[in-house]
Amino acid sequence: MGETVPRRRREDEKSIQSDEPKTTSLQKEVGLISGICIIVGTIIGSGIFISPKSVLSNTQAVGPCLIIWAACGVLGTLGALCFAELGTMITKSGGEYPYLMEAFGPIPAYLFSWSSLLVMKPSSFAIICLSFSEYVATPFYSGCEPPKVVVKCLAAAAIMLITTVNSLSVRLGSYVQNFFTAAKLVIVAIIIISGLVLLAQGNTKNFENSFEGAEVSVGAISLALYNGLWAYDGWNQLNYITEELRNPFRNLPLAIIFGIPLVTVCYILINISYFTVMTPTELLQSQAVAVTFGDRVLYPASWIVPVFVAFSTIGAANGTCFTAGRLVYVAGREGHMLKVLSYISVRRLTPAPAIIFYGIVATIYIIPGDINSLVNYFSFATWLFYGLTILGLIVMRFTRKELERPIKVPIFIPILVTFIAAFLVLAPVITNPAWEYLYCVLFILSGLVFYFLFVYYKFEWAQKISKPITMHLQMLMEVVPPEPDPK
């Protein structure tokens, strides 16, 4: 018994299952098609089917509304091309995290992981699953809203199922993503084809004088861009799993080049389809635009719309879990989270502890009554980190010239995206100042307290608490440390 104690005390440096192979690591099982499906499947969630009215409400006219949707697609593509350079230059999973680490050091990277892992990503995951559960439960409660308890229980079950699938197998998770992406493209095709047929039949009244009454103020345009970009969010998801991409130098940029323009074309055509059967006023009054479209165009087969929207939301939730779990994994590997979160399942070769942690935090977020306001105020932080990351790309052009760049975008692209990101961060604060933005900034900065206590100084008492927890979780989950951080 006495001989085993020292081995347990050294578990942070060496696995307690020290006879495991040294090559335990994430496997490269995501190809080009799966990469495109992850991008398309994560971007196209419930937003384009339920609330495209948010862009219209700020532009007040059909013409500017369609221009905003196109502009958001172009901006997403430009941002993703910058991330393609970063992803092929620094071939590590974790999205913005390793890029901020290389460009600016550990503190900005830690603050990104702190705010992303505890608020932005799990709360978004929870909202997507709540949206899915509402669509599933509503048909069983005709004439009234489904009980909150039912919706939350279904959302918790969805989170548990998605977490389990992605913990079991990378390949299974990507197959599930491919299936749901195909399903959502079916409903996208149905809406687009129906709209084009109606357009060919002469339903063009809503496109006449399409710029009349347009709102062109800075505040209105910034809010319209915010709402449009929310529907495009997910364009950087493939960078979270770079280490699992086959031939990332080829497949990462190709998936971006094919995936995001495809989404952009779909979004514009879907909006055109909506306007063939609804006036701007009717669209603004609709609670679920795609359902209204289905009732008017697809009856008596209109039931397929909520079914496929449910498929779309669960696909977006799966893509979010698949990629965000890797951020937890990389943060744990760098010592910015509990070490056990960076461990890999011996049997499944998945970052199971990271995915399970992400699922638990997301489940906590479905308990409160309304978390939309929290996410809305943190959405500006998303573009804060996007802008900071792309600024890091510009900085590394001068400070890290020795790094190989298989893809090198023209310098004006990251400069343009950085300026737009700064505009998106500052515009809502200036045009509609609120204390919540200050609270958001204070929360992000509060991560510094935990950074210096648990990461920088590494107090002995914290290590004594974490070591036995890590050891027991490692034995319970049959996980081991990964290979050394790829350089």
From Swiss-Prot:
Reaction catalysis annotation? L-leucine(out) + L-arginine(in) = L-leucine(in) + L-arginine(out); L-histidine(out) + L-arginine(in) = L-histidine(in) + L-arginine(out); L-arginine(in) + L-phenylalanine(out) = L-arginine(out) + L-phenylalanine(in); L-cysteine(out) + L-arginine(in) = L-cysteine(in) + L-arginine(out)
Transmembrane stretches, start-end:
32-55, 63-84, 111-137, 148-169, 170-193, 218-238, 252-274, 303-325, 352-370, 371-391, 411-431, 435-450
Give the modified residues of type Phosphoserine. Answer: S18
Q: Which residues lie on this side of the membrane: Cytoplasmic?
A: 1-31, 85-110, 239-251, 326-351, 392-410, 451-487
The positions annotated for binding L-arginine are I43, I44, G45, S46, G47, D233
InterPro entries to which the protein is assigned, alphabetical: AA/rel_permease1, AminoAcid_Transporter
How the protein sits in the membrane? Multi-pass membrane protein
Subcellular localization is given as: Apical cell membrane
Q: In which tissues is it expressed?
A: Kidney and small intestine.
GO molecular function per UniProt: broad specificity neutral L-amino acid:basic L-amino acid antiporter activity; L-cystine transmembrane transporter activity; neutral L-amino acid transmembrane transporter activity; peptide antigen binding
**Biological process GO annotation list?**
L-cystine transport; neutral amino acid transport
Keywords, A to Z, come to: Amino-acid transport, Cell membrane, Disulfide bond, Membrane, Phosphoprotein, Transmembrane, Transmembrane helix, Transport
Q: Which residues lie on this side of the membrane: Extracellular?
A: 56-62, 138-147, 194-217, 275-302, 432-434
Superkingdom of the organism of origin: Eukaryota
Q: Where is this region: Disordered?
A: 1-22
- Please tell me where this protein is predominantly located: membrane
The cellular component terms of Gene Ontology attached to this UniProt record, alphabetical and capped at eight, are: apical plasma membrane; brush border membrane; membrane; plasma membrane
Q: Which family does it belong to?
A: Belongs to the amino acid-polyamine-organocation (APC) superfamily.
Primary role: Mediates the electrogenic exchange between cationic amino acids and neutral amino acids, with a stoichiometry of 1:1. Has system b(0,+)-like activity with high affinity for extracellular cationic amino acids and L-cystine and lower affinity for intracellular neutral amino acids. Substrate exchange is driven by high concentration of intracellular neutral amino acids and the intracellular reduction of L-cystine to L-cysteine. Required for reabsorption of L-cystine and dibasic amino acids across the brush border membrane in renal proximal tubules.
Task: Kindly state the subunit structure of this protein.
Answer: Disulfide-linked heterodimer composed of the catalytic light chain subunit SLC7A9 and the heavy chain subunit. The heterodimer is the minimal functional unit. Assembles in heterotetramers (dimers of heterodimers) and higher order oligomers. Interacts with CAV1.
Indicate what this protein is called per its UniProt record.
Answer: b(0,+)-type amino acid transporter 1
Q: Which organism is it from?
A: Oryctolagus cuniculus (Rabbit)
